[in-house]
């Protein structure tokens, strides 16, 4: 139910939104052209993330570098299945690892010493060492859960 100026409107059933390749923001082709990076490999290594972040900063005329390039990093570190995408559509959920809310309690703690999360943290550190200001986007609990389990559960 949604309240609008004193009126109640029934919104009906919740509709599933099928997130597809066409729905992804990704990284614009003018950013990736000429960099010699291969995707999705570029989303998984410190040095390529540093390069991408700096080029995005330059192209956007921003004052900060941003990491990571998706909202799946934390869920992946907990065992989430991630589709790393390509140069057009970045990393996104690839499937659910939980089919019941109780299964969430059995997921491992995040391990910051391996995988893409470690590489992203190293990229952040390297950017800072190079004098860059970095915004590190941290996913919240609902975003993380959305990668791990279908919201219907």
What are these language model-derived features?
Residues 2, 83-153:
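Active-site-proximal, glycine-rich beta->alpha crossover segments in alpha/beta enzymes
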Residues 2-86:
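N-terminal basic, low-complexity leaders that serve as flexible interaction/assembly modules and, when applicable
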């Amino acid at each position: 139910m949604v309240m609008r100026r004193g009126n109640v409107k029934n919104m009906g059933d919740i509709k599933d939104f099928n997130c597809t390749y066409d729905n992804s923001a990704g990284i614009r082709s003018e950013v990736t052209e000429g960099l010699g990076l291969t995707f999705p490999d570029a989303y998984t290594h410190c040095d390529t993330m540093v390069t991408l972040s700096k080029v995005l900063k330059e192209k956007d005329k921003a004052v900060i570098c941003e990491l990571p390039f998706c909202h799946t990093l934390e869920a992946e570190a907990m065992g989430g299945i991630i589709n790393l995408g390509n140069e057009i559509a970045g990393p996104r959920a690839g499937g659910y690892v939980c089919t019941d809310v109780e299964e969430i309690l059995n997921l491992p703690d995040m391990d910051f010493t391996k995988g893409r999360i470690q590489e992203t943290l190293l990229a952040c550190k390297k950017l800072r060492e190079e004098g860059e200001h970095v915004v590190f986007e941290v996913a919240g609990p609902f975003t993380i859960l959305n990668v791990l389990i279908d919201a219907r559960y």
